[in-house]
């Protein structure tokens, strides 16, 4: 009779979360993850073909959680302001995890950038206030607000600033208005 599997995919993903949220992606190694579970690396490779597959599954799980839990909270009647407030709050409450995901350079950075871009466009395209704006203006709003959000989030994560929702709303609305008036913005990615 075969041995019963005691370490599941969920256990491994929980260990990955613990590692990345405390050490960042620099700690994303089979050995560190196995140590977190107090086991060998064998269960990891029984569940996942390789570390790239594990990273992709983990990032998919994280982005689903961000989409469904973090970015769905409403604070105002403006979807862009709400995205920013949620992003800054996430950074402030999960500073190491935020930096690991959105600041540090790692293999999933492009995937996370695409997630942020796609989520922004999903929100603005389904909002009456923004849906009729040109793609150029929406891109300008995204780029300007994204840069501002990353800066504010980095300040909040490092406890150098603690902006209130009202302050964030005021800054983002100013940035939206500037982007609408001056949409000629590019950012090489």
Model-derived segments and spans:
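Basic, helix-initiating cap at the start of DNA-binding domains
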Residues: 1-23, 32, 53-56
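Append "Primarily bacterial transcriptional regulators
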Residues: 28-35, 44
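Alpha-helical DNA-contacting segments of helix-turn-helix folds
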Residues: 53-62, 70, 101, 105, ...
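Amphipathic alpha-helical linker/stalk segments
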Residues: 56-83, 120-126
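Hydrophobic alpha-helical connector segments
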Residues: 70-96, 135, 145, 189
């Amino acid at each position: 009779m075969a041995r019963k599997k005691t370490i599941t995919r969920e256990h491994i993903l929980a260990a990955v979360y613990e590692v990345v949220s405390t050490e960042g992606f620099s700690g994303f190694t089979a050995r560190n993850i196995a140590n977190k579970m107090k086991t060998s690396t064998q269960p990891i490779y029984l569940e996942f073909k390789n570390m790239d597959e594990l990273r992709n599954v983990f990032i998919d799980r994280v982005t689903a959680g961000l989409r469904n839990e973090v970015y769905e909270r409403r604070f105002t009647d403006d979807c862009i302001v709400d995205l920013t407030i949620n992003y800054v709050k996430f950074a402030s409450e999960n500073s190491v995890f935020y930096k690991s995901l959105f600041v540090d350079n790692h293999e999933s950075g492009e995937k996370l950038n695409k997630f942020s871009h796609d989520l922004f466009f999903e929100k603005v395209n389904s909002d009456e206030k923004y849906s009729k704006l040109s793609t150029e203006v929406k891109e300008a709003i995204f780029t300007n607000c994204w840069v501002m959000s990353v800066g504010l989030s980095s300040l909040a994560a490092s406890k150098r600033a603690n902006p209130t929702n009202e302050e964030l709303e005021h800054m983002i609305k100013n940035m939206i208005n500037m982007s609408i008036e001056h949409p000629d913005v590019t950012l090489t990615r």
